[in-house]
Amino acid sequence: MEKHTIDPMVSAEHLAGAVRFATVSNADNSLTDYTKFDAFHEYLKETYPLVHKHLALEHTDQAGLLFHWKGTGKSGAAPLLLMAHQDVVPEGDPEKWTYPPYSGT
């Protein structure tokens, strides 16, 4: 796999783009708007094409994503697990925010 330089400003733009999705979950799954998660998944696919090209993607439930990065088995390195979550809590009272929720500011 070729090496890439990480630009901190581009990384910040990617993060700001990611937090613009109101991926609010609910204990009652019927109240969760999964179209927001679908849009977020599309954003990830467009923003990180190499991840989607080189890693195997498994959808674990209505919104869960599991990426499998297969090693060569030659290095003897221990397995590595990276985890994150996509859901957020409801924004509450927007008047209490310095910047609008989901603005990516």
Q: What do the predicted segments below correspond to?
A:
Residues 77-105:
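Active-site metal-coordination/substrate-binding segment of hydrolases
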Residues 1-2, 7-9, 41, 51-52, ...:
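Short secondary-structure boundary micro-motifs
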Residues 13-16, 42, 80:
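Active-site-proximal helix/loop capping residues that flank conserved catalytic or ligand/cofactor
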